């Protein structure tokens, strides 16, 4: 996010950030996870209803405000994956964003779509960012919704073994305009700063009383 900057409509620069879908909730528990056949059936079912689910998520109008103490935190988003190996693709969150852009362009003429292509207009993001999957071993601790520091568990037990928790984090790039201010902002009139912001995601954690449970924690999700 670009702090203390001119309105984007005045500088014609498109910023990038994470989309949040408050209607997206984790359902079920670890006991519902089965073997490979169960996973295959689950993926098939998801594929059959993928478009319908996306439409519902995009139509979700509920807004959940972060607490005043966590004013740098965004809404809930899904950036957590349980896997035996490092995920090769970004999470569903980014697929939803791409699909929304497709829907927005579907009602445009070909001529308008051509001119709406950022590459044709020479648009750049206001702030440069980097995204990558990180493990709980790299995070170690995080802040939950109550402001308490909790330990992020590296592995999640399942009926047939253990899976690692992976978090898809996005933060401001250490190179480029991060130190010089936001791209496209006239430095003669405005002071600006690229700053990493956070969102809440659900993860398996342990508090200082050794109680293990699923809690919403803050991770880096946009710049």
Swiss-Prot record:
Covalent S-S links between cysteines: 127-194, 172-223
Gene Ontology MF: a single term: growth factor activity
PROSITE patterns per UniProt: NGF_1, NGF_2
Glycosylation sites: 107
Pfam family of the protein (one): NGF
Biological function: Promotes the survival of neuronal populations that are all located either in the central nervous system or directly connected to it.
Official protein name in the record: Neurotrophic factor BDNF precursor form
Propeptide intervals in chain numbering: 6-114
GO biological process: cell surface receptor protein tyrosine kinase signaling pathway; modulation of chemical synaptic transmission; negative regulation of neuron apoptotic process; nerve development; nerve growth factor signaling pathway; neuron projection morphogenesis
Places the protein is found: Secreted
Transmembrane segments: none
Record keywords: Cleavage on pair of basic residues, Disulfide bond, Glycoprotein, Growth factor, Secreted, Signal
Family under the similarity heading: Belongs to the NGF-beta family.
Gene Ontology CC entries for this record: axon; dendrite; extracellular space; synaptic vesicle
Range of residues in the leader sequence: 1-5
Organism this protein belongs to: Calabaria reinhardtii
């Amino acid at each position: 996010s670009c702090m203390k900057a001119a309105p984007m409509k005045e500088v014609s620069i498109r910023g990038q950030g994470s989309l949040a879908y408050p209607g997206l909730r984790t359902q079920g528990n670890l006991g519902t996870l089965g073997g490979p056949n169960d996973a295959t059936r689950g993926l098939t079912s998801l594929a059959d209803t993928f478009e319908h689910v996306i439409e519902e998520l995009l139509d979700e109008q509920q807004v959940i405000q972060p607490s005043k103490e966590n004013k740098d935190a965004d809404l809930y988003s899904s950036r957590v994956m349980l896997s035996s190996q490092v995920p090769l693709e970004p999470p569903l969150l980014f697929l939803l964003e791409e699909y929304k852009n497709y829907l927005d362009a579907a009602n445009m003429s070909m001529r308008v779509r051509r001119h709406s292509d950022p590459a044709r207009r020479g648009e750049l993001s206001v702030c440069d960012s980097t995204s990558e999957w990180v493990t709980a071993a790299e995070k170690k601790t995080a802040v939950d919704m109550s402001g308490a520091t909790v330990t992020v568990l590296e592995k999640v037990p399942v009926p047939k073994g253990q899976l690692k928790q992976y978090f898809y984090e996005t933060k401001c790039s250490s190179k480029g305009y991060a130190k010089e201010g936001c791209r496209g902002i006239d430095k003669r009139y405005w002071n600006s700063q690229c700053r990493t912001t956070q969102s809440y995601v659900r993860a398996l954690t342990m508090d200082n009383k050794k109680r293990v449970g699923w809690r919403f924690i803050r991770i880096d999700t946009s710049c």
